Amino acid sequence: HYIFISSVQKYHFPPPTRVIVSDYNEGDSLRSLIRLLQEVEGTRVTLIGDVMLDRYHHGYSNNLNSTAPVPVLRVTNSEESPGAAAHIARGLFSMGLNVDFYSSVGDDDEGDLIIETLSSEGIQTDGIIRVEDRKTLTKIRFYGSRENLLDQSQVLLQADRGPLEDLDPRISEALTDSALGSLSSSQALVISDYDKGVISEQGSDMLISSAKKLGIPCIVDPKLTGLSRSSGADIVIFGIRGLELQKKRLMTDSLDEAASLLIETYSWGALLVLCLLYTSPSPRDHQP
C-alpha cells in the first residue's frame, strides 16, 4: 500500500487494521473526516445517489451454441443485491454509521427488493422515492468457465434493464432538498453519482457548498463523464482504471500528473484511488 502526494513523495506502510492520520493541514473538512474515521460508532452520514440492483448468475460453459459462436452457460447458482449508492449505504451502516439515505427506485419488484433488503438490515429507507411507472435499473451479469476451471470464472455477458427516459427533475430536486435538510445533523456528506438522474449539476453544487459552510467533509464517488458534479469535494474516489482512463484523456505522462491536474481543475481536496491518495502539496504526519 502506498500514499502518493502531488509533490511525488511516497510513503509505504503495511496493510493496517486501522490507519490514523493527523496534522493534515488540508482545512477543517479534511480534519473532520479524520475524526470521523477515528470515531465511527454512532456518527451520522448523509448519503445521496443513484441505486441499482446487481444480479449475478454463475455457472460453467463447456460448449458453444449450435447456431451461433456463443457459449452456453449452465447456471449453477444466482444471487442479487442492492448496488451503487445502496451498496455504499450498506457498507457505511456495517461500519456503525447512521445513514440518512436519499435515492429513487422504480415501482417494480426490483425496487421492492432493494428497499426490503436495506430495511431488513436496519437501514432507513424513508428517503427513497418510488417513481410510478418506472423501472429500476438492474445490471445482470453472467459468469462462467469450463467445468474443470471453476476458479477461473469470467464475465460472459452483461445485460442492463432499466428506464429509457430521464428521471423527472422534480424527483432529483426533492431528493436534494431532503439531503440538504439532513446536513445540519450529519458529520459527513457522501454523493454516489452514476449519472442516472438523482445527482444534477445544480443539486451537487448546492450539496457540496452547504457541506463546506457547515464544515463537514464531502466525499464523492463520481461518474467519470460528469466530474463537474464533484467540483469542490474534499475527497473524490476513483478505481485505478478510472484514473488510467483520465490519464489517456488528459494526455499526461503519468498517473501522478493526471491526478494533480484533476485536483487542480476541479478544486478537490484529495483524490483517493484504491490504495493511492493524491492531495495538494502540504506537510503531513502518517501514523500506521
Regions found by a protein language model. Name each.
Residues 45-47, 218, 236, 272-273:
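Residue-level marker for buried hydrophobic side chains located in beta-strands
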Residues 1-2, 9-12, 286-287:
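Low-complexity, intrinsically disordered or signal/transmembrane-proximal segments
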Residues 278-288:
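Single conserved hydrophobic/aromatic residue that forms the stacking wall/gate
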Residues 11-39, 209-211:
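Short coil-to-helix leader/linker segments, especially the first N-terminal amphipathic alpha-helix
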Residues 61-72, 142-162, 167-257, 277:
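Conserved beta-alpha-beta core of the PfkB/ribokinase-like small-molecule kinase fold
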Residues 13-16, 20-24, 45, 53-190:
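Conserved N-terminal subdomain of the carbohydrate kinase-like
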Residues 266:
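Phosphate/diphosphate-binding loops
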